[in-house]
Amino acid sequence: MKILFVDCCISQRGKASRTEKLCRTFLRSVRAEHVDLKNLELKPFTAEMLDRRDGLFRSGAFGDEIDALARQCRDADGIVVGAPFWDLSFPAQLRIYIEHISANGVTYYYDAQGPHGNCKARWLLYLTSGGDFARDGSLGTEYWKQLCAMYGIPEFRSVFAGGLDAMPEQADAFMKEACGKAGALAAELLNTADFPD
């Protein structure tokens, strides 16, 4: 079982990051391949980068560094994404990562019927926390849900620890509840009997 952890747990709190605590709760019983976006220093795609990647796609020459993150995402059995709830969605580093993994011919492909997913993952779990409370149609959550459909990942789950700054006197209780949900999802999603060797 190959689990990919996309870590965008950017916080002034450092190791006291609330989103990171959610992620640690879920991941404590499994080894995951860790992509730390805080240290990766990805750059947004430029026209030149797109031309290069499109050229590789046309020639079928995948394996270049430019699509390495996309191949890593495509090959995972399960994906965990951790990011704080910022400005109604998530930090810019995560959006730039999405540009790098959304590679035609790697994580998805087109034919006459439209786009089709190419990812092996059975599920993607989005873990997030924020000072405010959850709203219906949260942009970050909806974005990942749509990406799962595009990448062919059949199951999307999310846990949001919200209200942590709006009601600081209840923040510990809110975190405990969210960590409980993350732990329950770990027991369900990380059942190794469901994954091939």
Show where each model-derived region lies.
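Short, glycine-/small-residue-rich phosphate/pyrophosphate-handling segment
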Residues: 110-153
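Conserved nucleotide-sugar donor-interacting segment of glycosyltransferase catalytic cores
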Residues: 101-113
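Glycine-rich phosphate/pyrophosphate-binding loop and the adjoining helix
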Residues: 135, 141-197
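Hydrophobic/aromatic residues located in beta-strands of well-ordered beta-sheets
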Residues: 3, 32, 123-124, 156
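N-terminal beta1-alpha1-beta2 submodule of the flavodoxin-like/Rossmannoid cofactor-binding fold
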Residues: 1-99, 103, 180-197
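Short histidine/acidic/glycine/proline-rich micro-motifs that form metal-
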Residues: 9-14, 130-134, 165
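Cofactor-binding loop segments of dinucleotide-utilizing enzymes, especially the Rossmann-like FAD-
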Residues: 8, 37, 127-130, 161
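Short secondary-structure transition/capping segments
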Residues: 72-88, 128, 153-170
